[in-house]
A protein has these predicted regions:
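A hydrophobic alpha-helix adjacent to the NAD(P)-binding/active-site core of NAD(P)-dependent oxidoreductases
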Residues: 4
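Conserved Rossmann-fold NAD(P)-dependent oxidoreductase catalytic core, especially the SDR/UDP-sugar
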Residues: 13-60, 81
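Substrate-positioning beta->alpha
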Residues: 63, 67, 93-98, 112-134, ...
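Conserved beta-loop-beta element that borders a ligand/cofactor-binding pocket
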Residues: 69-91
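Conserved C-terminal active-site "lid" loop/helix of NAD(P)H-dependent oxidoreductases
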Residues: 123, 158, 182-226
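Mid/C-terminal beta-alpha module of Rossmann-like enzyme folds, strongest
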Residues: 133-198, 232, 236-239
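Amphipathic terminal alpha-helices
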Residues: 214-222, 226-248
Length: 248
């Protein structure tokens, strides 16, 4: 929790305060927040999360990102544009790479049995959104970012399997209560060893969330955002990159 607060809020605040103190306020300050600041909402009707909704983060990561947003939005004289991307994937990304490695070994784990709607954003499309905001001189605005599609929980793993050329994969749906116990034990063990566990209480809450839809229409209508990487195209690129760089 402290590390998230330090990395996402304290360092952001210190950097911005230094810019203001030195009279080096930029024309625009782009802050990459997260869809996670809204927490698990609309899980009954699976409606897209929009700017009309109230942010209610349930993770230390989400809380730290929201804290940074509130700080930046309180500075009326500081030109900020905020992006709230959904799951970002691309070359060098390691969290999703763990899933790729697992599927290469013919195992795919999915959290829970209830419907889960997922959204993704390839890093190049996120960069496109950032440059559009810079070109349009956007200030004091926040946008959700995804590739505009909604995917079933199996779609990502099926695409990875296809690009890896795996003839078969065992798909295992893990009950949430088991996943929670494993996450807590992994976090405790890592803490005892002075390490950071990829699987932890925060990660469990993220995997547990069922609705990751978000409304990108303001980004499309105001800035002309046109995502170029649907999931199949993005997965093809990252698998090719992992192979080229010797990760696989």
């Amino acid at each position: 929790k402290d590390e998230f607060d330090k990395g996402n809020y304290v360092y952001t605040r210190n950097f911005v305060e230094a810019l203001r103190t030195l009279d080096m306020v930029p024309r625009q300050f782009v802050y990459i927040s997260s869809l996670s600041i809204f927490g698990p909402i609309h899980e009954d009707n699976y409606a897209p999360i929009s700017e009309r909704d109230t942010a209610m983060p349930n993770t230390a990561y989400g809380v730290s990102k929201l804290k940074s947003e509130h700080y930046l939005q309180s500075l009326n004289d500081f030109p900020t544009v905020i992006f709230r991307p959904t799951g970002v994937y691309g070359p060098r990304e390691r969290d999703y790479f763990l899933m790729v490695k697992s599927i290469k070994q013919h195992i795919d784990f999915a959290p829970g049995f209830k419907r889960q709607d997922l959204t993704f954003i390839y890093v190049r499309d996120l960069v496109q959104a950032v440059f559009l905001a810079i070109e349009h001189g956007v200030r004091q605005r926040a946008y959700f970012v995804s590739d505009g599609n909604v995917y079933f929980s199996r779609t990502f793993s099926d695409l990875i399997q296809k690009e890896l050329g795996n003839p078969w994969v065992i798909h295992i749906k893990c009950p949430l209560f088991i996943l929670k116990v494993v996450s807590l034990l992994a976090e405790f063990s890592a803490r005892c060893l002075g390490k950071v566990s990829t699987l932890n209480a925060d990660k469990y809450k993220i995997m547990k969330q069922r609705n990751w839809q978000c409304d990108i229409s303001p980004l499309v209508e105001e800035l002309g955002y046109r995502p170029e990487y649907p999931l199949d195209k993005g997965v093809k690129e990252i698998i090719a990159w992992y192979k080229k760089e010797g990760w696989l």
